[in-house]
């Protein structure tokens, strides 16, 4: 029998916590990235922060779209970092390690999000 807290399982609560973390990272990217872009820096952070915030919100709503938005932003991050520094592992590591680690956690939440979507659909609260 799974651990339950209220009507949610532990994995659902952890998924929601991950959604909050992604929202906070996305907000930081948008706010600090806008400042950086105004100073003439890369607009990557603003462009990447928007789907992070949206993805985190969708994860809080229990929708798989949130996970796929994050994974899309992760793919954009990989392309950007390759364009920025090439194939140098020393330069790629700080750009890709954290987002990829979060991406692995997000990918692991997809079955949980699907279960949450199915339960919501069965209740009729789309």
Curated annotation (Swiss-Prot):
GO cellular component terms, A-Z: plasma membrane
GO molecular function, one term: glycerol dehydrogenase (acceptor) activity
Membrane-crossing segments per the record: 13-33, 41-61, 67-87, 92-112
Bilayer topology term: Multi-pass membrane protein
Localization of this protein: Cell membrane
EC number(s) given by UniProt: 1.1.99.22
Disulfide bonds: none
Catalytic activity: glycerol + A = dihydroxyacetone + AH2
Taxonomic superkingdom: Bacteria
Keyword terms of this UniProt record: Cell membrane, Membrane, Oxidoreductase, Transmembrane, Transmembrane helix
Keyword Hydrolase: no
Entry keyword Cytoplasm: no
Role description: Catalyzes the oxidation of glycerol to glycerone. Also acts, more slowly, on a number of other polyols including D-sorbitol, D-arabinitol, D-mannitol, meso-erythritol, adonitol and propylene glycol.
Protein name per its UniProtKB record: Glycerol dehydrogenase small subunit
Biological source species: Gluconobacter oxydans (strain 621H) (Gluconobacter suboxydans)
């Amino acid at each position: 029998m799974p651990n339950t807290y209220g009507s949610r399982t532990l994995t659902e609560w952890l998924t929601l916590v991950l959604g909050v973390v992604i929202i906070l990272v996305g907000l930081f990217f948008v706010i600090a990235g806008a400042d950086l872009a105004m100073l003439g820096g890369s607009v990557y952070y603003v462009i990447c922060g928007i789907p992070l915030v949206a993805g985190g919100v969708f994860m809080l709503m229990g929708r798989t779209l949130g996970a796929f938005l994050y994974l899309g932003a992760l793919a954009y991050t990989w392309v950007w970092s390759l364009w920025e520094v090439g194939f140098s592992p020393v330069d790629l590591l700080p750009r890709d390690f954290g987002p990829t680690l979060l991406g692995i956690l997000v990918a692991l939440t997809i079955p949980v999000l699907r279960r949450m979507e199915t339960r919501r659909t069965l209740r009729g609260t789309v």
